């Protein structure tokens, strides 16, 4: 893997992890357009580590408060908004975790085709548009209820379908529940922390079972750094943009991307 390939793939991972545009669609498109070989599991682990570091660093102050208040709730000091948000992140991860354990083999065998990815990219773009137009957009993430946690958590499980976009489907669900665009995105990004950690851990187990030979450690480290920096900038500017714009540009992009994938692979 050369320098240019490392930079492109790390940027794709860092940007598509948090934008509602489907990382699977891009990760199938890039090799098709470039004819590159598979980058290997070690590189995937590195870019996931970079993305995870980015979201943890970006929300470090919120995470510190949430952790302290969560520990306080365990000690019987009541359920403050930050403690409830911490519980919401943990409990909201359960549906996707269970679905991943139960349906991983089925998804890997039957749903990783380019056609499925293209149709999911298009279909969930339409749903995102509907949520953006119809949602009340009056609530922030600290007003979250257990019903919200269940709905958004189940929605996140749908992201196991390639082409859905984890951030896209969780933002969609949060908008439908009345959250503002920024609050929907913030909760989605907080939810990504345990999910990315679980995915990275699963990949590390695979790497331990079947170690790769001739790992290019320089490119691995570079990939993690590029993915991390690009993910951090993506989170920062995406949240700023949501204060001024709708989801329409991302919907249009997904529709065009999905149509292009159908054109290439149908």
UniProtKB/Swiss-Prot annotation:
It is a multi-pass membrane protein. One of its GO terms (molecular function) is undecaprenyl-diphosphatase activity. One of its GO terms (biological process) is cell wall organization. Its EC number is 3.6.1.27. It catalyses: di-trans,octa-cis-undecaprenyl diphosphate + H2O = di-trans,octa-cis-undecaprenyl phosphate + phosphate + H(+). It is found in: Cell inner membrane. Disulfide bonds: none annotated. It holds the Pfam family BacA. InterPro entries: UppP. It is an enzyme of class 3 (hydrolase). Keywords: Antibiotic resistance, Cell inner membrane, Cell membrane, Cell shape, Cell wall biogenesis/degradation, Hydrolase, Membrane, Peptidoglycan synthesis, Transmembrane, Transmembrane helix. Belongs to the UppP family. PANTHER family: UNDECAPRENYL-DIPHOSPHATASE. Catalyzes the dephosphorylation of undecaprenyl diphosphate (UPP). Confers resistance to bacitracin. Bacitracin is thought to be involved in the inhibition of peptidoglycan synthesis by sequestering undecaprenyl diphosphate, thereby reducing the pool of lipid carrier available. This is Undecaprenyl-diphosphatase. The gene is uppP.
